């Protein structure tokens, strides 16, 4: 472990801010003579915080900035760049103070803020002292004082990220901070409730009850890893980072020991530039690698390695634990020699399968999805594979291939809500079992009682290096922690029963399931699941002619939020879809998209046949409204990728679902880049994204999503329906929207035949493991400019296939509020049911033969005619009345209810434009 000591030299430069009277003697005493200090869990009572103290701290920060601006210092403008960090910290503190103007007492009483300000004062004073003591050595780039300055810069970086995470937009939200890993979140909730920050000793004792800590030396090493801000406290933010780095929770400390304590490739508190400098020694030994915590994307690892052609690259693994990334990289020849050593640790022992998180569905939910011709387990993006992965912390579910494709297309955040993807968990959705209770089976065990190791003497800068070395030398392989308790969660969210329309009262929506599980096999497609009688086949009219290219313009957006019911029919939640006669299909686009060349499907394309129409990014118009387009690989659009929905279907519905709004165009651009991407980058380790030479912005994992885009213009809703979420709002949904689509599409359909089916659908899909830059210009929250894409005609058979996922996306996880100002849609868009495969194929065949059924072919009876006239006199359009009657099977009372529920008479958007 000599390499560990050498590589981390000076890593403790930030220390805890004190003089460290005990030093190594104190560390050894703590390791071998654990004693009991219950009397004072807090290391020291925090000072009083007022505006005067904050301003004093600002003066110290200003002094540090002036010292660092000395030209002789010649600081590199690469993260962590202290000349950016301190001004950013100052600016965010100003924002916090402005939010608490007149309420400074409230802010001063906030425990986290007091601890933060005290630590900021200490670290700025420590930096000033470093300049005084280091003198001329500060100007030597490789000197110890200069290394300590770099360490302090990292600490300032961590502090700023933490401050932004706990005070997003300047408002305290530490008590609602969302811990990414469900098991870790449950531990924190049980141990500390809604506390934002706890003393290290309290944290250590609570953690020991779940993950036994073998010695005081191990406790000290653990503290040096988890206490990113070096203040003797552990915040919920730091805990979230640690549990993401060393996932899974069930073997947390075992993973930490294998990756941070004993692994020669681990680098504590190293920067991007320092990793490059270190690997330069092994430039002629391809496969040499080291890894560190990413300072700009806290909670993720950055792996630096030497390529076969003598380059040094740094990558960030995606959607997998570090040990899995290292194993995969070793197998593929990328990560062979940790820190240049010939012996590479075997990490396969960490790959023990975790207990599967089985999501079970109740009988009612099963029947509801059958009514829609779908199943809960079907991925609502591709409508082909079963869901097998859960995005954290938002909780949305999808299949791995869709998530991978989305990320490779440079999609930002979660495809559904744009919340930052802090982690993923494999899940399994079980088919309905009539004998099951529908509840989740959890398992767990209690750990040993907590020892009370004391570690008061941990303040000296480099003691942690000695401690890590000693711990590594004596470390034996530890068993996995018995604790694998996942939080209790209710059942997956589903829409309401249509047959309960009249008698059902509002009920709270159930939540998305959180927890860990092994990956599901995604090819079965519920062939072993008994289904009730499938829905009646509803045939779609023939597709539009394939002879004209689709034109994209910049028409004015309609004033209503469209429903995600069909690719081209997206009316408001509160209104039945109108039947426009001339509105082109691009009127829903938020901004013009450049025309793209026509291409033909490539039969060998791996995505040939994949229904990327169901990616739901671009709301299209009805086929009857669309200009026919050339038959090219089509790019679909699921509206819910752009429209955050407000169904209370997950644990964060409510106060925590105030995610920022996203422009549809950002999703469109990401999906476009998926459909027509440039040639893939040189092959790099799979599932990883790279780092550029310099990170220029600081990511801030927070309780809110990071993907903040400019909100799209909202369409006001004149209807004053209440914002009921989930069940009550969808009582007509389960069978409604396909019928609505059929009527509307037939109203103006053309009688051309066209080849249909999934075989003619293809999108370019890039290969395994591209690496993106860790340059923060490419961060999660900045959408890429649109990549020219291949747009294709959507045949009506495609639309029947696409219906599998339109609108049901938000049933798969976390909803979010899509609100701003006075133009907030009062309800989320209505979903559109999908067809089961048999129905889809039958419909496809019938379309090929040009045979369609017309549900409104017969003329209404005289009684119906009089009712229709009466409704028209009230302001309803004839098309809306006809659609409502078909949906209600000519039940005039139900049709009236539908009209009242969905149609706003006064809305100007009700008239086709």
Curated annotation (Swiss-Prot):
Question: Which residue windows does the record flag with biased composition (Polar residues)?
Answer: 509-521, 750-770
The gene designation is Cbl
User: Compositional bias (Pro residues) spans?
Assistant: 531-548
Tell me, in a sentence or two, what this protein's role is. Answer: E3 ubiquitin-protein ligase that acts as a negative regulator of many signaling pathways by mediating ubiquitination of cell surface receptors. Accepts ubiquitin from specific E2 ubiquitin-conjugating enzymes, and then transfers it to substrates promoting their degradation by the proteasome. Recognizes activated receptor tyrosine kinases, including KIT, FLT1, FGFR1, FGFR2, PDGFRA, PDGFRB, CSF1R, EPHA8 and KDR and mediates their ubiquitination to terminate signaling. Recognizes membrane-bound HCK, SRC and other kinases of the SRC family and mediates their ubiquitination and degradation.
GO CC, alphabetical: cilium; cytosol; flotillin complex; focal adhesion; Golgi apparatus; growth cone; perinuclear region of cytoplasm; plasma membrane
Q: Which domain of life is it from?
A: Eukaryota
Phosphotyrosine sites (modified residues) = 369, 672, 698, 737, 780
Q: What is this protein called?
A: E3 ubiquitin-protein ligase CBL
Q: Which InterPro entries match?
A: Adaptor_Cbl, Adaptor_Cbl_EF_hand-like, Adaptor_Cbl_N_dom_sf, Adaptor_Cbl_N_hlx, Adaptor_Cbl_SH2-like, Cbl_PTB, EF-hand-dom_pair, SH2_dom_sf
Extract the ranges annotated as region (Sufficient for interaction with EPHB1).
1-355
Which residue ranges does the record annotate as region Required for ubiquitination of SPRED2? 356-913
In which organism is this protein found? Mus musculus
Q: Which PANTHER family has this protein been placed in?
A: CBL, E3 UBIQUITIN-PROTEIN LIGASE CBL
Q: One GO MF term, please? A: SH3 domain binding
User: What Pfam families does its record include?
Assistant: Cbl_N, Cbl_N2, Cbl_N3, UBA, zf-C3HC4
